Every structure is written in C-alpha cells, then in structure tokens.
UniProtKB/Swiss-Prot annotation:
Source taxonomy: Archaea, Methanobacteriati, Methanobacteriota, Stenosarchaea group, Methanomicrobia
Family annotation (Pfam families): GlutR_dimer (PF00745), GlutR_N (PF05201), Shikimate_DH (PF01488)
Residues the entry annotates as binding NADP(+): 180-185
CDD domains the UniProt entry points to: NAD_bind_Glutamyl_tRNA_reduct
Pathway it works in: Porphyrin-containing compound metabolism; protoporphyrin-IX biosynthesis; 5-aminolevulinate from L-glutamyl-tRNA(Glu): step 1/2
Protein name stated in the entry: Glutamyl-tRNA reductase
Function according to Swiss-Prot or TrEMBL: Catalyzes the NADPH-dependent reduction of glutamyl-tRNA(Glu) to glutamate 1-semialdehyde (GSA).
Length: 422
C-alpha cells in the first residue's frame, strides 16, 4: 500500500550551515529528481530559512527517502524520518506554527501553501498529498481563528529586529541597512517601520523594488552597486535576499571596518546565507544568523504554551478526520477499479451477445437499451455487497481484506499520480 513518508531537517537538530549542506539545487530540480524515481508516486518539498522537508507517496515508505538522504550526504544526526501518521501529524503541527522556531508564527502557513502550489504546478502531487496539504492549510487557519496561538508571536523577520535591539540596547539613533526586498526583507522593513529609527536604507538588485518599498513603509532606497558605502554608514545590516551566493563577502566588510571602532552588527536571515561567516573574525563585527534567534523566541514562548495545548486538541480532532478520509480513499480506489473492470467486461460481453443476436434478428435501439440497462443493473447489484464490505474493511483498517480483494479480482496497479496503491 502507498502512503506518505517524510524526511525532516529543522532548526531543532541542525545548524544553518548543516541545513545548507543538506540542500542541492532549486525546488524544481529536487522535485524532478524525486519524481523521476519509479517508486515515488507523488512528492512535495518545503524549504525555508530553518527547515528542509520532503514528502513522498511511495509503496516503499521511508526507504526511498533513506536512499535520497544518503545520496545527498545528509548526516543521520540532523534528519528525522516519519511514516504516514507521523507525517500527517507533523504537517498539521507545522501549519499551526507549533513546529516553528517562533511558536505560533503566521508566515509558515503561507509558505506551506506556496510550496504546495509549486509542487502542484510541477505535476508532482496527486490525491494523497493534495488531501494532506489541503487539510494542513485548513487546520492552520482554524487554529489561528479558535486560539490565540499567534498572539505575541514574532516572525523570523521581527525576531531579527528584536535581536538587534537587544544587542545594541535600542535602535533609536541607529542607521539600519536592509538588503533584500522580497517577502522576508519586506517583513523586516515593516518591523523596523514600527520603531523610531534614525534612518533605514533599503538595497535590492532591482532598484525599483527598493524604491517602491521605501515609498510604502518609509526609508531610503539605495543602489545595490553602492552597497559598500551604505554598509560603512550602517550600525546594523539585516540581510534577507534569495541569492545563491554571499552578498556580503569578507573582503568588503574588512574594507568597511578599516579604521572603524564602533561596532557593526550583521544579522543574516537568508537561506542560503547572505553573509560570509568569516566576517566574524573581523574586529568590531558582530555576526548573528538564524541560530541566534532562539533567545528571542524563549522570551515570549511561555505566554503561548497554553494556546498550544488548545491547538493540539484541534489537531488531534482534525487528524482523526483526515485519517478517516484516507481510509475511504483507500477503499474507493479499489472499488473504482473493481467497477471499471467489471463494467468493461459487462460491455464487451453485451456487445458479443448483441452481435450473435444480430445474426438472427434486427437489434434496434430499444432492444439495445434494455440489454444495456439489464447488464448494468446486474453488475451493480453483484458489486453492491463487496462495495459495502470494502468500505467497512477500510474503516476498520483491515488491509489484509483489501489486498485479498485486489488479488482476487486481479485489480491492476493504478497509474502514477493517482496515489493510493501500487
């Protein structure tokens, strides 16, 4: 039987560097690599600044992911493998913000939706993963409506700003440079705009995007090729681009710091990292990345733990419902195949009988309709009781019965992407 398995690497066990080392290529490439495996029926990938997660639907369970992790050189110390039920629970908890570094944060829900749509667009998800991800998105919304799990929660972006405030004992008289005006950079700028900043510089490779964000939230847009000038002017640099390489290299920062005695705080919340870790060796430079945000999370964690317990109750309830849905799907796939094969045989035999009768009598539309209705009714009545038994078996997890019926009626494997059994 084909079910969901998942491979999860997160901030809980892995450092930023280890997560970078575990990722090879862009999302489309990874989806393509996974889906090209004949044992994988469906697949989806989640990749954020503090997690890499892969979900597959396969008759071989986690063994497909064990092999993939080995090929990618992923250390066993940082990866978790989940079976079907564990994968479902994890995905629901993730959508509710319970697996996030910042418990209850809202950004993860949008990320799950985006990555699901990406896999859908690539044609790598079918019925099984669509059910799981749709349920996760629904539950994430329900938990945020029925609890206060996200009250007081901060995003990675606002946590970066809070961290800067803690390290520098306030930001009121500071010059801040934000590099990157994508989703994360916009969130950083928005968090800064709520504070009384001296000046915020916004840098992006596409100047117009920086200019538009500066006009919307306040700040000064700067040309990307003048980065050195504005790093020199800044007290804090928060970098959040999607570049595949370092945006702030060691030699640039070293040049900026020549003769400078006041500290320069660099906060890197990009994935992969934007800032060369070697800059930490430069005098008066303070470097922090995702790993350093844990302290901020601890500050407001306690107030959300009561709400987290309420969320767990909702998750338990919704998990039971989605598991029941999968049970129905399991039986429905066999039933659909059974009806399809049976009616195919019925139609062929009816046509054979009509051809024989046509040798002796003229078979008109009325006679053909009578034979069609008769054979259709007989076939459906014969299948009615087996259908009931199959649905009962699925409800009570009687996989042996389901498998026996499949073998008895020689129900052939379904095509890749239908995703219930193989």
């Amino acid at each position: 039987m084909t079910e969901i398995s998942s491979m999860v690497i997160t901030h809980a066990k892995a450092t930023v560097e280890e997560m970078e080392d575990s990722w090879h290529g862009d999302i489309d490439l990874v989806l393509s690599q996974l889906y090209s495996n004949e044992l994988v029926y469906e697949c989806a990938v989640l990749k954020t600044c503090n997690r890499v997660e892969i979900y597959v639907v396969s008759s071989k369970g986690s063994s497909v992911l064990f092999h993939y992790a080995k090929e990618m050189g992923v250390s066993a110390k940082i990866v978790e493998f989940y079976d079907h039920d564990e994968s479902l629970r994890h995905l629901l908890r993730l959508a509710c913000g319970l697996e996030s570094m910042i418990i209850g944060e809202d950004q993860i829900l949008g990320q799950i939706k985006d990555f699901f749509l990406m896999a859908k667009g690539a044609g790598t998800v079918g019925k099984v993963l669509s059910t799981a991800f749709s349920k996760a998105i629904q539950v994430g919304k329900r938990v945020r409506t029925e609890t206060f799990i996200n009250r007081g929660a901060v995003s990675i972006a606002s946590a970066a700003v809070d961290l800067a405030e803690d390290i520098l004992d306030g930001l009121n008289d500071k010059h801040i440079l934000v590099i990157g005006t994508g989703e994360m950079g916009t969130l950083v700028t928005r968090a800064l705009s709520h504070r009384d900043m001296h000046v915020i510089y916004l840098a992006n490779r596409t100047y117009e995007k920086a200019r538009d964000l500066a006009e919307e939230l306040g700040g000064e847009a700067v040309m990307f090729d003048q980065l050195e000038k504005y790093v020199r002017a800044a007290d804090v640099v928060i970098s959040a681009t999607s570049a595949p390489h370092y945006v702030l290299k060691g030699d640039l920062v070293a040049k900026v710091m020549e003769g400078r005695e006041n500290e320069l705080l660099l906060i890197d919340i990009a994935s992969p990292r934007d800032i060369d870790p070697a800059v930490e060796e430069i005098p008066h430079v303070i470097l922090r990345n995702i790993d350093g945000l844990r302290v901020i999370n601890e500050k407001n964690l306690q107030m959300r733990m009561v709400e987290a317990k309420k969320a767990e109750i909702i998750i338990d309830d919704e998990l039971d419902m989605v598991k029941a849905q999968y049970k129905r799907q399991k039986a429905d796939a066999i039933i659909s195949n059974l009806y399809s094969q049976s009616h195919g045989l019925r139609h062929n035999e009816m046509e054979h009988a009509i051809n024989k009768l046509s040798a002796y009598h003229t078979i008109g539309e009325i006679e053909r309709k009578v034979l069609e209705d008769l054979t259709h009714a007989i076939t459906n009545k014969i299948l009615a009781e087996p259908t009931k038994k199959l649905r009962n078996a699925a409800e009570y997890d009687d996989d042996k019965f389901l498998d026996s019926v499949s073998r008895l009626f020689d129900i052939r494997p379904i095509k890749k992407n239908d995703g219930i059994t193989k």
